[in-house]
Amino acid sequence: EESKAKAYAVASEVVESKLFPLTEALTTENRILFDEHIFSLHIYEMEKVVDPDFIYQNVSGLGVGKELFGQFYDLSAGGSTDFRSGNAAFHEMLITDDTKKILSKYDQTGYASDHLPNYTGAYSGADVMPLIRIPEMYYIMAECDPDPQSSAEILDMVRFKRGIASSDATDGGKGYDEPDTREGFDSGHTRRINEVMREYLKEYYGEGQLFYFYKRHNYVTFANCSLVDVRTKYQFPLPENEDMFGITGK
């Protein structure tokens, strides 16, 4: 509980600084929500890295079926107005007779950079890989807040900015901190943790934070996972050269 209190305090300090405001719209000129970046990497000519896989190739492993995509973003239950699932975030591609949703987050079209044809002299977030964005601070607060209703309201601060209506607010009432008995959810975790997980899934699709959330909470499995138990996969195998030469830190 002490570590949760400290995590809440630090995350709250970042939020209250107001240096990284939540964005209320996603456009093709700002697919990665650059103003929300607390820390990110610059990758020169990033389009040469991402375009072959995300733009030009029919790679089924990078696409998600429309039915599963709808489940991820709650499209039939209030999520249809969530801009994180919109046309600036994903595009459709026909792959082996099936329409898939393909991530557009790293598509460099529309950005301004000195090596791109539309450069105007104003930097807009081209060639950037986000590592920490401000929504994660809200999610840390929602996870650590001892008050269930306050936790739900903090989650909704991000959700509402993403276009979800206030009528679809998160329920922080009875059962919020009890094992989640809803169909399709991991009953090994509370409804609070599963609600935070769902927001990580929507917000950080293609960024990597969701993996570490699963790992930190030791999820046995998750939506669309082909394994019954993934826990042995959370620790990556050592690179061969480290194993061979004993550079293991042991």
Residue positions per predicted region:
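Acidic/polar-rich alpha-helix caps and helix-coil junctions
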Residues: 1-66, 77-250
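Active-site-proximal, Lys/Arg-enriched surface segment
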Residues: 72-73
